[in-house]
């Protein structure tokens, strides 16, 4: 899935769109998504000027965005002005390796539980096969009206 299709499933846009490509997607199971981390990211000038590191919260957000794509695709719907997937919870977060400019962040997110419009996931973000971040995520699909 390229960026043109991804933006059909995510409301995020620059500078907060953190999924560049979906490599694999098994509906109701898992997604494998990619974020190319470049020196042009808007957060690097401040985090940190002489040693740029991608903020851990944005790595977790990138996994949550991948989870949202998986959820919408699995439900067979696209977000619109009346629906949104909210990041509802996070547990067991571990940051194991810094993510720096030039890295390709490979995010694998699997659905571990779903009930009505609430989904739980296990996410692992890797760089060159090495775990950078792992977390348990929870998202909720909400209808806005």
Curated annotation (Swiss-Prot):
Catalysed conversion reaction: a (3R)-hydroxyacyl-[ACP] = a (2E)-enoyl-[ACP] + H2O
List the active site.
Answer: 47
Q: Which GO terms describe its molecular function?
A: (3R)-hydroxyacyl-[acyl-carrier-protein] dehydratase activity
Keywords in alphabetical order, please.
Cytoplasm, Lipid A biosynthesis, Lipid biosynthesis, Lipid metabolism, Lyase
- Supply the enzyme class, top level: lyase
The EC designation for this entry is 4.2.1.59
- Give the record's GO CC terms: cytoplasm; membrane
Domain of life assignment:
Bacteria
Enumerate the HAMAP family for this protein. FabZ
The protein's job, in short, is: Involved in unsaturated fatty acids biosynthesis. Catalyzes the dehydration of short chain beta-hydroxyacyl-ACPs and long chain saturated and unsaturated beta-hydroxyacyl-ACPs.
Could you tell me which NCBIfam families the record lists for this protein? fabZ, PRK00006.1
* The name this protein goes by in its record: 3-hydroxyacyl-[acyl-carrier-protein] dehydratase FabZ
Q: Which organism is it from?
A: Azoarcus sp. (strain BH72)
State the organism's lineage.
Bacteria, Pseudomonadati, Pseudomonadota, Betaproteobacteria, Rhodocyclales
**What gene name is listed for this protein?**
fabZ
